[in-house]
Amino acid sequence: MKILFLNGPNLNLLGQRQPDIYGTTTLAEIESAVREQAEGRAEIEFRQSNDEGELVTWIQDAVSEVMVLNAAGYTHTSVALRDAITASDVPVVEIHLSNIHAREEFRHNSLIAPVCKGQ
């Protein structure tokens, strides 16, 4: 099985940005832990971008069996990501590092959740 993990804006700052919300674990440490768990069972690829257009292109070009997407701030604003997910034949699972429903009200709504296989 091939799994593509896509990480959106500011996730490159994990470990230093708002540790009270996101913790002190870096994105590289998360990637390492996932690779270790998947070893011998799945081929894992990670990508991170602060650019919405680049994320859209990666979704459009995905050659994997499943995508795991942390769209970060784009979760609540990006019609472009929603449309790219809708157009893709690859199932997408939306993930977050914090509970978006327990945060500021503007974070409660996900534009991408309705077109993902799970949240």
Language-model features, listed with the residues they occupy:
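Extreme N-terminal starter segment of soluble prokaryotic enzymes
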Residues: 1-4
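A short acidic, helix-capping loop that chelates divalent metal ions and anchors anionic groups
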Residues: 12-21
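Short amphipathic alpha-helical segments
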Residues: 17-18, 59, 80-82, 105-107
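Short catalytic helix/loop segments, enriched in acidic residues and glycine
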Residues: 20-38
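Nucleotide and nucleotide-moiety/phosphate-recognizing core
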Residues: 33-65, 82-93
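Short, glycine-/small-residue-rich phosphate/pyrophosphate-handling segment
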Residues: 45-46, 93, 101-119
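Mid-chain, well-packed structural core segment of small domains
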Residues: 66-103
